[in-house]
């Protein structure tokens, strides 16, 4: 039996820990706050992030990272993208030497413009073959209640990818393996930005034609950037690209879409944050780093640029849309 440490007890970290436990994997979660760990252990519920969801009795938790990591052969990194580096610097000396490191974080690091796998490799010194990412249409609450979903486990080491697949396959969660780590990470990072755009459009009362257009042109941006970085277009046409994009752009469970709706309705970043339980959507932070990464590769991403300008330069949503529609016409 595999032993997994899930570092991070937010909604997705908790849901994926449940998946692992349901698949027969021995799982210990690390929670930053002792009361969250205590709730998981004693009440089998993470009331802060997945209220009302019963967690398996076999799933344990602690606020001691060293205890969680002890003997783990799978280390799941389930903290937000912009805090991954700081956390890893603390955890790295405790991580077992040959453990597979699986990133659930979706984003591009601000400043360095690194993908999450690159951050992991740089901080831990791990061989790239030990680092994997998981990405797909995986809204935490739907998975936590056992609704069927699929995902992609990407790793350049096919043996480790298969081990992760086995450790997380259940009757409701179907992981596919892939070797295209770059494609999975770019799809996961960029979809949050496009979901913000969809939310903004919905927030000002625009309809399905607009949303469909944003999703489709957003996918074109994602593919352009992914290919420039070495991703395979087929990856971005799959679960880690189109699948994740559609789920995040259309579901009311999507924090990024909900955050964008608040902005479209005229709310500030602060009021949108308050409406999403105090959490800033990943796309708000990632839009600037994705934009900068695209610029460094001379890749045009007008939707991403528009989201950045709304979130960080004070541009009104209606004006951003007008500027997009006023661009020079060209072939698809």
Curated annotation (Swiss-Prot):
Positions bound to sn-glycerol 3-phosphate? 106, 136, 191, 244, 254-256
User: Tell me, which GO biological process terms does this entry list?
Assistant: carbohydrate metabolic process; glycerol-3-phosphate biosynthetic process; glycerol-3-phosphate catabolic process; glycerophospholipid metabolic process; phospholipid biosynthetic process
E.C. code: 1.1.1.94
**Active-site residues (renumbered):** 191 (proton acceptor)
Q: Which UniProt keywords apply?
A: Cytoplasm, Lipid biosynthesis, Lipid metabolism, NAD, NADP, Nucleotide-binding, Oxidoreductase, Phospholipid biosynthesis, Phospholipid metabolism
Task: Name the pathway.
Answer: Membrane lipid metabolism; glycerophospholipid metabolism
InterPro entries named in the record:
6-PGluconate_DH-like_C_sf, 6PGD_dom2, G3P_DH_NAD-dep, G3P_DH_NAD-dep_C, G3P_DH_NAD-dep_N, NAD(P)-bd_dom_sf
**Pfam families per record:** NAD_Gly3P_dh_C (PF07479), NAD_Gly3P_dh_N (PF01210)
Localization, per the record, is: Cytoplasm
Q: Where is the signal peptide?
A: none
Where would you say this protein principally sits, based on its record?
cytoplasm
GO cellular component terms listed in the entry, alphabetical order: cytosol
Lineage, top-rank taxon, reads Bacteria
- Catalytic activity annotation: sn-glycerol 3-phosphate + NAD(+) = dihydroxyacetone phosphate + NADH + H(+); sn-glycerol 3-phosphate + NADP(+) = dihydroxyacetone phosphate + NADPH + H(+)
Identify which top EC class this enzyme belongs to: oxidoreductase
- Residues noted as binding NADPH in the record, renumbered to the chain: 11-12, 32-33, 106, 140, 255, 280, 282
Job description of the protein: Catalyzes the reduction of the glycolytic intermediate dihydroxyacetone phosphate (DHAP) to sn-glycerol 3-phosphate (G3P), the key precursor for phospholipid synthesis.
Similarity-based family: Belongs to the NAD-dependent glycerol-3-phosphate dehydrogenase family.
Specify the protein name: Glycerol-3-phosphate dehydrogenase [NAD(P)+] 2
Q: Which organism is it from?
A: Rhodococcus jostii (strain RHA1)
- The UniProt gene name for this protein comes to gpsA2
């Amino acid at each position: 039996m595999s032993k997994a440490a899930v570092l991070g007890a937010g909604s997705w970290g908790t849901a994926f820990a449940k998946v692992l436990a349901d698949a027969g994997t021995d799982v210990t979660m690390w929670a930053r706050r002792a009361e969250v760990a205590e709730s998981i252990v004693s009440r089998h519920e993470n009331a802060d992030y997945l209220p009302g969801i019963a967690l398996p009795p076999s799933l344990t938790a602690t606020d001691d990272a060293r205890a969680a990591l002890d003997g783990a052969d799978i280390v799941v990194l389930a903290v937000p993208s912009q805090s991954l580096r700081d956390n890893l610097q603390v955890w790295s000396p405790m991580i077992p030497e040959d453990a597979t490191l699986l990133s659930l974080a979706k984003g591009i690091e601000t400043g360095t413009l690194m993908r999450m796998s690159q951050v992991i490799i740089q901080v831990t010194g791990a061989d790239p073959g030990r680092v994997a990412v998981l990405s797909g249409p995986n809204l935490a609450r739907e998975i936590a209640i056992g609704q069927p979903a699929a995902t992609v486990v990407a790793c350049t080491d096919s043996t480790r990818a298969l081990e992760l697949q086995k450790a997380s396959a259940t009757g409701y969660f179907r992981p596919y393996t892939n070797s295209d780590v770059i494609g999975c990470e770019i799809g996961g990072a960029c979809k949050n930005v496009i979901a913000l755009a969809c939310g903004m459009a919905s927030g000002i009362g625009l309809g399905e034609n607009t949303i469909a257009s944003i999703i489709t042109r957003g996918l074109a941006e994602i593919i352009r950037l992914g290919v420039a970085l070495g991703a395979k277009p087929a990856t971005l046409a799959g679960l880690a690209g189109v699948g994740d994009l559609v789920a995040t752009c259309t579901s009311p469970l999507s924090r990024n879409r909900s955050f964008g709706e608040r902005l479209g309705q005229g709310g500030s970043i602060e009021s949108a944050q308050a409406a999403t339980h105090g959490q800033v959507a990943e796309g708000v932070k990632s839009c600037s780093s994705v934009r900068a990464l695209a610029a460094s590769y001379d890749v045009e991403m007008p939707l991403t640029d528009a989201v950045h300008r709304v979130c960080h330069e004070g541009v009104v949503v209606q004006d951003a849309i007008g500027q997009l529609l006023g661009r020079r016409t060209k072939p698809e």
